[in-house]
Structure formats: structure tokens, C-alpha cells
Amino acid sequence: MAAAIGAGLPIAEPNGTMVIDIGAGSTDIVIISLGGINDIETVRCGGDDIDNKIVELVAEKYDVAIGIHDAESAKMEVGMVHCSEQLDNLSVEVIGKSLETNRPKKVVIDSMLVADAVEPFMQRIVDGLNIILERLSPELMMGVYNNSVAVGGSSRLRGIKERIFDEI
């Protein structure tokens, strides 16, 4: 509710507003109408799951263990939902621990790797969005279409809002 108010959405109106809150451990998709919560769908995935997937992919690809905070920093610095190799691929260097030698090893985490980590979770969020939209009354559909916001740390990933709102 606070996110909708902070975004200046018309929560007291009867037409409906939607807030997609991508938290650390879960994503809440909330429909607000007439100043109250009309419906909510919780998807059990969030930013922490993406960070853990980045750690896993770096270990698989480079045979290097990185810390969860390095994964989160890389996600926020170079992360995006879709990445075209020639135009969008950004990268960041991270020092991890070689799983082979147990020594420090520098790896490059790029936007492509982060996009690969994000995709399975994006699909779960989109599935949750589709579930709540199926339950949505026709009277609220236009308001939700016109008055929606995504919030939370991972909502700052490039392309995530476009991907979510393309589904509406």
C-alpha cells in the first residue's frame, strides 16, 4: 500500500491499481481498489534467489566461488532481463575463490550471465501475474493496466519493468 501511495497511484479510486513488490525472498503482486487490498498473489521467489543463481552459474562457468554480496552487486551493476550480446553486454570483475586451487581468482560477470540467472525467476513472476490477472474483475482491468508499479531492489534491473508490463 505504501509503495502505491509513494508512486502517486490513485489507490482510493474504484478502478484498481497494481503493485508488484519484488522483495528479497518473495514477490507480492497486489491489487488495490477503493483504498484497500482487493487481491494478492505471492510468488516464492525474489532478489535473493537471483543472487544465489548467479553464485551457482559463476561456479559452473568459471569453477570459482563468489560471495553472495558480490553476486548481488554484479546483479545491480550489470544486470538486465534480456541481453543482446552486441548492444547491451556490460561486465564487472569480481574476485572469488578458485574451486580448483583454493586461491583468489578474478572472473568477469557479464549481463548475459545475469540475464540467464534472472530468466527462470522472471517466468515465475510472470506466471504469478497471469494468475492474479485471471482472477481480476473486468471493472478493475483498465485501472490495473494504466496504474501499475514495480518496486523492490530487483525491480531496478534494466528491462524488468518492461518485461513485467508487457504481460499485462
Residue ranges and their predicted role:
Residues M142-I164:
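Glycine-rich phosphate-binding loops at beta-strand->alpha-helix junctions
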Residues S33-E119:
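Phosphate-binding glycine-rich/basic clefts of nucleotide- and phosphate-handling proteins
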Residues M1-I20:
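Conserved phosphate-binding catalytic cores of ATP/NTP-utilizing and phosphoryl-transfer enzymes
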Residues P10, A117-V144:
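Phosphate/ATP-binding catalytic cores across multiple sugar-kinase/actin-like superfamilies
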Residues D21, I54, L129, A150:
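Residue-level signature of catalytic and energy-coupling elements of molecular machines
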Residues V19-S26, I32-G36, G46-D48, G152-S154:
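A short acidic Gly-Thr/Ser loop motif
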Residues I11, I22-S26, L34-G36, M142, ...:
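Short flexible coil/turn linkers enriched for glycine and charged/polar residues
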Residues G6-L9, V30-S33, E41, V55, ...:
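Short acidic, glycine/serine/threonine-rich loops at helix termini
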